[in-house]
Structures are given as structure tokens and as C-alpha cells.
UniProtKB/Swiss-Prot annotation:
Source species: Saimiri boliviensis boliviensis (Bolivian squirrel monkey)
Matches recorded under Pfam families: Ank, Ank_2, SAM_2
UniProt-recorded name of the protein: Ankyrin repeat, SAM and basic leucine zipper domain-containing protein 1
Domain SAM: 274-336
Modified residues (Phosphoserine): S17, S18, S20
Alphabetized PANTHER family for the sequence: ANKYRIN REPEAT, SAM AND BASIC LEUCINE ZIPPER DOMAIN-CONTAINING PROTEIN 1 (PTHR24157:SF3)
Annotated function: Plays a central role during spermatogenesis by repressing transposable elements and preventing their mobilization, which is essential for the germline integrity. Acts via the piRNA metabolic process, which mediates the repression of transposable elements during meiosis by forming complexes composed of piRNAs and Piwi proteins and governs the methylation and subsequent repression of transposons. Its association with pi-bodies suggests a participation in the primary piRNAs metabolic process.
Encoding gene (name): ASZ1
Lineage, broadest ranks: Eukaryota, Metazoa, Chordata, Craniata, Vertebrata
Keywords: ANK repeat, Cytoplasm, Developmental protein, Differentiation, Meiosis, Phosphoprotein, Repeat, RNA-mediated gene silencing, Spermatogenesis
UniProt-annotated location(s): Cytoplasm
A Gene Ontology biological process term: transposable element silencing
Length: 477
């Protein structure tokens, strides 16, 4: 804009730097009284200086006037090879970018693999202005997949700097989402590293692969955790992403229309949504510390029921690590309850089933209840108490509360049945004690005479041992 504020010194975008500290650009305010040209009598060098100052201050009218003079070319290069368009893009001056492009500036110009589009995506300015600059450059056929010397593409710079709408526009214009730079970073990795949750959600929605590793073997979730972005770590590690690839089927025009008509206020309210799905499989794996296996099981369409009935050879066939197999098998052994087929037993056998097998059944049933209690406690501790800390937007809480109410009813029914079982056992025990024909077990019989004999034997043995010790002591003396 013609009256925009003073811009900073131009530097190469995307982490690049010039070979000389003197880049040819000057900082300062123009004297408005001497700003206009007085005819065509000024020397060429003075016009170049005025042109650079006009670019610095964003004086569009002066830039147009100097270009109209015909002495300065729209693709003129200054020190370290930057053109006026590259400089205008570096300060996110959309109006200057439009003027220069309309005058024939080359949108595909690059210097040392630094493109104008990369410069715009890494510019210091508002996202609104950066978005306008990027849109103008893309409309003039700037390639969104040309990388810099570090193999970083425009979408990586936009993701690194937190420009959600720019990322979406680049993808709509053909940018590759899963391209990796020289360190193996993708746009998703950069967003996770910098803590831009909205970018992470948008990239997942656009088909980003969260399983691509860096050169040192790190996943985006691990990069987020290392930089203490715990929300993003949880988002990438413990949740499914049903919206992944949602926009890939849209045409370029449909996607651009969707992006440009988005209400900025809605965007600030987290319009990029997904749903956390904690099913029985996820809870089971989380309880064993095997969260990393969730994606593997989902890819192979293995349900919890199938997992619990797998044999050892099936674990190996499906690519389970030996350590993970041992954890699952140990858990299955603890949960195993021997099924008792009462209908196949004779009347005499039914009377005898109330022994060790029945006790073992009750003990295992009690252990399973303990596991269920622990699972619920773990979920309670994992859920944030503040709704603002929820990483993903959830469905209506009414759905969750209705299921919880059903759980409470089932627990109450279970409690009632267990109480009935307890009363029945107590009744059987009372009848047994009052039955005159009942013969107590051998271990239950403890007569007065047997107790006296046991105590006498112990006393005699102890006294004899004491005499033996005394005798040995006197002999030594």
C-alpha cells in the first residue's frame, strides 16, 4: 500500500543469506517533499536509488512512475541478484507484487535456487498479505514444488511459519504434501516442530503421512514431544484421523473456493476438526503400553476380538515384534477364564463343581473386574478437565453420557447378580453347617486331645534341644 509503514532490510527468505552484509537496500523514511520526480532530468543512478527507496517504503505510485520512465526495468537486479518482485514478496507487499506482475515481472525467477514463491511463503508479514502474494504468484504459473538448496519447498516454509490458509492454497495448486527436505522433514514435521496445531490438522486433512520419518528416524509425533508440544504429540500418536485425505478428491477450483470463502472468525475457532476415537482396541493397547501398534492393526483390519483369539504363528505372520507378542499373550493369560459347561455335567458332578474350579472362576472374575476398574481410572486421568485443552473437536457430549448411563445400569445389574450369588452361597454354607449328616473335612477336625499332643511334643523337643546346647557348652569349658 502506498502509505504502508517502513519495511525492514531485505534478507534472503527461507534461511538463506546473502554473501555480503551490504545488500544494496537502504532503510529510512522518504522526504515526502522531494519524493516526486521533477521531469525526466534526474541521472539514472539517482533514479535507481529512488526506486529502491520506493520499494522499501511501499510507495506504489512512485514505483509506477519510475517504471513508466523506461529507464528502470521491472526485472532489474540489485546486489546479490534480487529483483524488485522478489523484494516486494519478501516484505509481503501484495499491492507492489500485483503492480510488478502486471508490468511483466517474472514470477518464476530464482536466484541460487531461491524462488520468489519461497520468498513470499517465508515473508515477515500478516498471513492475509502473504496469502494474497502467494495467490498472485501462483496465478502467474509459479511452480509450488521447486525446492531451495536445502530441498525445502514453499509448503514447508508456510507450515513452519504457521500460515494455514497458505498451506491449503499451495496444496490446491498442486503442491506435494509429503515431500521431504535434506533432513527428512515434511511440512507436517515442520508444523509439529513449531507447535502449529491448526497446520497439523489441516495437513492431516489434506493427506499428510504422519508415519514418514526424518533422516535420524524420528516421527512427527516424536519431534513434537521433543519440543514439548504435548497436544500435538497426543494428536499424532493416540488418535485416528477419519478426515485424512478428505480434500484430495476436490478439484483445484473447488478447493480454492472452499479456502477463500472461509470465515476468518470460524478459522480462529478451530474449524479444522477431527474426531478422537478411543475404541476397545485402543484402550486395550494403551493399557499394555502398545499404542504404537494401533496403526498396524488398523491397516490389517484386526479387531480386538480377532487379536484376543490369535495364535503365536499368526502374531509373527502379521509382523508383531517378539516383545509385543509376549505382552499380549501375558495379558490374555490373565484374562482367560475357563468355561464351565454345567449342562453337560451329571447331577453328582454339579454338586462337586463348587470346589476349586468354582473358586478359581470367582477369582478370575474378580480379577477381570479389577482390570475394568483400572481401565476406567486410566481414561479418567487421561481426559483433560478443561475443554479448551481437548486436542480435537468431539461429538456431542450427550452421546458419551448416554453410554455412561448404560454402563452404570449394567454395573448395577452385575452388582445385584453378584449379591444374589453371595446370598445363595451363604445359604448353602448355613445349610451345610446345620446338616447332621455332614462330615467335616479332615483338616477341619481339631480335637482337644490332638492339640494337647501337639503342644506336648513341641515342648519336649524344645527342652531336649536346650539340654543339648547346655551340654556342648559345658564340655568346651
Amino acid at each position: 500500500m502506498a502509505t504502508s509503514a517502513l519495511r525492514g532490510l531485505a534478507v534472503a527468505g527461507g534461511g538463506e543469506s546473502s554473501e555480503s552484509e551490504d545488500d544494496g537496500w537502504e532503510i529510512g523514511y522518504l522526504d515526502r517533499t522531494s519524493q516526486k520526480l521533477k521531469g525526466q532530468m534526474l541521472p539514472i543512478e539517482e533514479k535507481k536509488e529512488k526506486f529502491k527507496k520506493a520499494l522499501t517504503t511501499g510507495d506504489v505510485s512512485l514505483v509506477q512512475e519510475l517504471l513508466d520512465s523506461g529507464i528502470i526495468s521491472v526485472d532489474a537486479t540489485f546486489r546479490y541478484g534480487w529483483t524488485p518482485l522478489m523484494y516486494a514478496a519478501s516484505v509481503a507487499n501484495a499491492e507492489l507484487v500485483r503492480v510488478l506482475l502486471d508490468r511483466g515481472a517474472n514470477a518464476s525467477f530464482e536466484k541460487d535456487k531461491q524462488t520468489i514463491l519461497i520468498t513470499a511463503c517465508s515473508a515477515h508479514g500478516s498471513e492475509e498479505q502473504i496469502l494474497k502474494c502467494v495467490e498472485l504468484l501462483l496465478s502467474r504459473n509459479a511452480d509450488p514444488n521447486v525446492a531451495c538448496r536445502r530441498l525445502m519447498t514453499p509448503i514447508m516454509y508456510a507450515a513452519r511459519d504457521g500460515h494455514t490458509q497458505v498451506v491449503a492454497l499451495l496444496v490446491a495448486s498442486g503442491a506435494e504434501v509429503n515431500t521431504q527436505d535434506e533432513n527428512g522433514y515434511t511440512a507436517l514435521t515442520w508444523a509439529a516442530r513449531q507447535g502449529h496445531k491448526s497446520i497439523v490438522l489441516k495437513l492431516l486433512e489434506l493427506g499428510a503421512n504422519k508415519m514418514l520419518q526424518t533422516k535420524d528416524g524420528k516421527l512427527p509425533s516424536e519431534i513434537a514431544k521433543r519440543n514439548k508440544h504435548h497436544e500435538i504429540f497426543n494428536l499424532l500418536s493416540f488418535t485416528l484421523n477419519p478426515l485424512e485425505g478428505k480434500l484430495q478428491q476436490l478439484t483445484k477450483e473447488e478447493t480454492i473456493c472452499k479456502i477463500l470463502t472461509t470465515d476468518s472468525d470460524r478459522e480462529n475457532d478451530h474449524i479444522f476438526s477431527s474426531y478422537a476415537e478411543f475404541g476397545d482396541l485402543e484402550v486395550f493397547l494403551h493399557g499394555l503400553g502398545l499404542e504404537h501398534m494401533t496403526d498396524l492393526l488398523k491397516e490389517r483390519d484386526i479387531t480386538l476380538r480377532q487379536l484376543l483369539t490369535m495364535r503365536e504363528d499368526e502374531f509373527t505372520k502379521n509382523g508383531f515384534a517378539s516383545k509385543d507378542q509376549q505382552k499380549i499373550l501375558a495379558a490374555l493369560k490373565e484374562l482367560e477364564v475357563e468355561e464351565i459347561q454345567f449342562g453337560e455335567l451329571s447331577e453328582e458332578a454339579k454338586l462337586e463343581i463348587s470346589g476349586d474350579e468354582f473358586l478359581n472362576f470367582l477369582l478370575k472374575l474378580n480379577k477381570q473386574c479389577g482390570h475394568l476398574i483400572t481401565a476406567v481410572q486410566n481414561i479418567i486421568t487421561e481426559l483433560p478437565v478443561n475443554s479448551q485443552k481437548i486436542a480435537l473437536e468431539w461429538a456431542s457430549p450427550q452421546n458419551f453420557t448416554s453410554v455412561c448411563e448404560e454402563l452404570v445400569n449394567n454395573v448395577e445389574d452385575l452388582s445385584e447378580e453378584v449379591c444374589n450369588l453371595k446370598d445363595l452361597i451363604q445359604k448353602l454354607q448355613n445349610e451345610r453347617e446345620n446338616d447332621p449328616t455332614h462330615i467335616p473335612l479332615r483338616e477341619e477336625v481339631s480335637t482337644w486331645n490332638s492339640r494337647i499332643l501337639k503342644r506336648t511334643a513341641i515342648t519336649v523337643c524344645g527342652f531336649g534341644f536346650l539340654l543339648f546346647i547346655c551340654k556342648i557348652t559345658f564340655q568346651r569349658k
